[in-house]
């Protein structure tokens, strides 16, 4: 059965709506620390965040999208594809309306929890309790619980390391800190993108190539930083940590796009598949690029157009952040989110960054 194109248009609109409100509501996850610490203006931060959110969506968006489309509800037993289409559209619209309300109230809200709940509700109504993949549901819920604690612990560890290093400030120490953290950010991103299976050969290949690429890029940027580093030790310290804060904020934006784009792209992918093929492939291993792109653009536009409304809540009202503590919070949050994204788990970026700031 091939559905009418009007369902595709309505589904695309609903997915774009969720993506747009997602960007407006969760922009603070990426730039709240930078704005709260006074490192960057809101306007400039929003544009950078929109760009890296889109990049994260394009490179990593398929992993969580597949989970939302097929991992929660056993949709293969539904004979009428139109039921799946209506269910996905309903889940998108209900999530979008709830997010509009929370955004108007300036309350940071987890869209992942909202869309998972909506899809779960659709599944319970259409296929019943027995056709819900409860092991995956509990795995997702468990990640919502442990993610903030992981962010807190990582943030505390990094802060203690940072405190020891800056207790005896020197140019060499600042350059080492810069090199180590940029290498970590690059390695994590490249490795998670390259690794395809858990086989030793695949992991070794991804690990080796990631090490080579990340260290090479980091060393090149370190040479550039060394050339432009201010001679005054205090200015040098501020310059290094401002640079690291910028990189970590963009890593957080990248992670946000990678995970949260699925909240729109996953349901939309199901609608696109049914429109084009009349069914959702049983051996689904990919998500249509159009679903990822439309959702990614929606998030970016939401960030640019309305993201300023909740930035102050995360950046300034939770705690007073310095440039250095802001960097630690963003680095911790982005690292944990990117890892669980690669595992295909829809998580709350809001909870992760709040946990990191708390730590």
Regions found by a protein language model. Give the residues of each.
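Alpha-helical transmembrane segments and immediately membrane-proximal extracytoplasmic
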Residues: 1-359
């Amino acid at each position: 059965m091939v559905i009418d194109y009007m369902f595709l248009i309505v589904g695309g609109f609903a997915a774009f709506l969720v993506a747009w409100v997602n960007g407006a509501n969760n922009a603070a996850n990426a730039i709240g620390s930078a704005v709260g610490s006074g490192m960057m203006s809101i306007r400039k931060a929003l544009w950078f965040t929109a760009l890296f959110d889109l990049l994260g969506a394009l490179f990593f968006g398929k992993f969580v999208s597949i989970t939302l489309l097929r991992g929660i509800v056993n949709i293969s037993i539904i004979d009428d594809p139109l039921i799946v289409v209506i269910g996905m559209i309903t889940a998108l619209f209900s999530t979008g309306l709830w997010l509009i309300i929370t955004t108007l109230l300036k309350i940071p809200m987890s869209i992942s929890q909202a869309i998972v709940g909506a899809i779960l509700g659709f599944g319970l109504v259409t296929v019943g309790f027995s056709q819900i993949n409860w092991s995956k549901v509990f795995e997702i819920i468990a990640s919502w619980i442990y993610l903030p604690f992981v962010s807190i612990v990582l943030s505390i560890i990094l802060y203690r390391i940072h405190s020891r290093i800056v207790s005896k400030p020197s140019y060499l120490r600042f350059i080492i800190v810069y090199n180590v953290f940029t290498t970590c950010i690059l390695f994590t991103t490249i490795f998670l993108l390259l690794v395809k299976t858990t086989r030793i050969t695949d992991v070794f290949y991804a690990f080796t190539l990631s090490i080579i690429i990340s260290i090479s890029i980091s060393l090149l940027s370190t040479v550039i930083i060394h050339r432009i580093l201010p001679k005054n030790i205090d200015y040098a310290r501020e310059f290094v940590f401002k640079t690291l804060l910028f990189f970590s904020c963009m890593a957080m934006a990248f992670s946000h796009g990678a995970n949260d784009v699925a909240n729109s792209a996953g349901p939309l992918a199901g609608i696109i598949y049914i429109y084009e093929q009349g069914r959702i492939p049983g051996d689904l291993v990919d998500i249509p690029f159009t679903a990822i792109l439309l959702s990614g653009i929606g998030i970016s536009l939401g960030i640019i157009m309305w993201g300023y409304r909740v930035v102050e809540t995360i950046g300034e009202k939770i705690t007073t952040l310095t440039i250095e503590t802001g960097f630690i919070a963003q680095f911790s949050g982005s690292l944990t989110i990117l890892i669980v994204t690669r595992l295909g788990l829809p998580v709350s970026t809001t909870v992760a960054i709040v946990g990191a700031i708390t730590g």
